[in-house]
Design a protein with these regions (language model features):
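Acyl-CoA-dependent O-acyltransferases
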Residues: 2-130, 298, 305-518
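Non-catalytic, low-complexity flexible loops and terminal extensions
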Residues: 56-59, 63, 69, 156, ...
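Short, flexible turn/loop "capping" segments at secondary-structure junctions
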Residues: 79-83, 207-208, 289-292
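Acyl-group handling in specialized metabolite and lipid biosynthesis
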Residues: 85-100, 135-173, 292-298, 361-365, ...
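Short strand->helix junction
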Residues: 95, 221-222
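Acyl-thioester-dependent condensation/acyltransferase catalytic cores
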Residues: 110-215
Length: 518
């Protein structure tokens, strides 16, 4: 999702390879636009040379600013009418003023908004009615008076200092969303208004004693985690004084309307009933406000422990599953031990579901740098008896087998067709009838590693990447984040008090793998 991938046809590449190598990145819009979209090639589009650089013609610059091109299908779910938050924690460098930091941040986000027009727009819903959830689209939005929202809590006695956060490895309990965010996150919907437009891209900078906490926000109807971290990557590049490479701009500004085809009349739609739930309303929210005393926690798995875990989970694999990933092994461990902590409340034949958010880019043949929503869900079911008695390798194999079977272009196209044909999409969620008492909902960006820890110019490299502590609990939620550039994994989870106590105080096997941060 952040790896730079681009290619040019052989003839053009051979003619310009030396020039291209010398100028791999430059200012926005000094690049080749989508040469291959809709059959375009260097032979049938106009490109110009200026100072040895490939530059888009005015025609293609105009296309990038046509906001209709960013209309998609997978981003149409009302459950995505929320802001996704990612916190980056930095120590404040010596001899660097706040004014310099804020100036660089402001210029960087302005540069990104200019280079990727939909990131400078806002999300609106049109055509909503009693029987339809309407259409989410981006619309023009005047630039904000200030590019970023700034808070100074360095003298706030109720706010932790950076040293305190670092000593405790930034537990989520110390990252209150009320202090470090300006708008709520999932699952609370954000409503566009004249006073506070639902801008696609937002940024909050909060100074604390000895440090800075930056909240990077993106509107979820317009981007998944790939797009979110793609925008952060571009801001970091701008703060380092770098321009944006051709391939990155191509994918960031890619036309979404024909990204992939929906099912045709002779193609059978799969059964997506598991994604249906009653409409989400204020009286019937996505998550019950009476969740069983659940809280959010951060758990760390070191790079060494992850290697050992994968080796253990790879012993005795089913013959039809020749390979499992580190995420498979970690998912199996969490699913098994969460179930062990819950088992006293349920019978052995109780069914548990592991709902896994999956990036569909590879299955669809889409670049990792594409920034729109391409997430779908793969659910795997086992009974409590199976989860508590099966060895880790068998559970990991079961997860991998289902992922291989369902993470296909056909499955994703079918899900998109299902969304497109459903007028009221408020009945559709990734988890469907998710039971927080028995199920686990998992997503992962663990594999990004160094990509999530770039240098931000004068700020340097962040020491922690976190989510803020939400105001709404979502029991059963599980997220894998890179804990460090060296390969550690920080797991962000939400469990009941009795469950987390069982894991961290009574489950000796769990404790040998995981370090509790808080």
């Amino acid at each position: 999702m952040a790896t730079l991938l681009w290619w040019l046809p052989g003839i053009l590449l051979s003619a310009l390879s030396r020039v291209f190598s010398a100028f791999r990145s430059y200012l926005p819009f000094r690049s080749v636009t989508e040469l291959h979209r809709n059959g375009h090639s260097p032979d049938n589009v106009g490109v110009s040379l200026e100072d040895g650089l490939l530059a888009p013609t005015e025609k293609f610059e105009e296309e990038w600013r046509d906001l209709d091109r960013y209309q998609d299908v997978l981003g149409q779910l009302p459950m995505l009418q929320v802001y996704a938050h990612i916190l980056y924690l930095f120590p404040v460098p010596e001899n660097v003023s706040r004014e310099e930091i804020l100036s660089d941040l402001s210029q960087a986000i302005a540069k990104v908004r200019n280079a990727v027009p939909w990131m400078g727009a806002k999300v609106v819903n049109v055509g909503k009615s009693a029987n339809s959830s309407g259409l989410y689209r981006v619309a023009e939005c005047a630039s904000p008076l200030n590019e970023i929202d700034v808070r100074d809590l360095s003298n706030d006695a109720t706010c932790p200092s950076y040293d305190d956060l670092k000593k405790r490895k930034a537990p989520i309990s110390m990252l209150d969303s009320k202090k470090f965010t300006s708008v709520p996150g999932f699952p609370i919907r954000f409503e566009d208004s004249k006073e506070d437009p639902s801008r696609v891209l937002r940024l909050n900078a909060t100074f604390i004693k000895g440090g800075l906490v930056i909240d990077f926000l993106i509107h979820h109807n317009m981007a998944d985690a790939g797009g979110h971290f793609g925008s952060i990557k571009m801001i970091a590049m701008a703060m380092r004084g770098e321009g944006f490479p051709i391939g990155l701009l191509q994918q960031a500004n890619r036309d979404r309307r024909n990204l992939f085809s929906l099912l045709g009349p002779n193609e059978k739609m799969l059964d997506h009933s598991k994604h249906i739930r009653p409409p989400i309303t204020s009286s019937a929210p996505l998550v019950s406000p009476h969740a069983n005393a659940a809280k959010y926690h951060v758990i760390r798995f070191s790079a060494k422990k992850l290697d050992e875990l994968k080796n253990l989970a790879s012993q005795g694999l089913d013959p039809d599953v020749p390979f499992i990933s580190t995420d498979d092994a970690l998912s199996a461990l969490c699913w098994k031990h969460f179930t062990l902590a819950r088992a006293h409340r349920f019978g052995p034949q109780t069914e548990s579901r592991f709902a896994r958010a999956v990036d569909g880019r590879a299955a669809l043949g889409i670049s990792k740098d594409y920034m729109g929503d391409v997430i779908h869900n793969v659910s795997t079911f086992l009974t409590f008896e199976q989860l508590t008695t099966w060895p880790l390798a068998r559970i990991a194999s079961h997860l991998r087998r289902h992922l291989n079977a369902k993470n296909t272009a056909y499955d994703i196209r079918s899900f998109a067709t299902f969304i497109a044909k459903t007028p009221d999409k408020s009945t559709i969620t990734y988890g469907g009838q998710f039971n927080p008492a028995t199920d686990v909902g998992c997503s992962s960006v663990r594999g990004l590693g160094k990509v999530l820890f770039p240098s931000f110019g004068v700020l340097g490299q962040p020491e922690f990447v976190r989510r803020p502590k939400p105001g709404v609990v979502f029991p059963g939620l599980l997220v894998f984040f890179p804990g460090s550039p060296g390969g550690d994994c920080d797991v962000w989870l939400c469990l009941g008090d009795d469950e987390i106590k069982t894991l961290t105080e009574k489950d000796r096997e769990w404790m040998q793998w995981a370090e509790y941060i808080g």
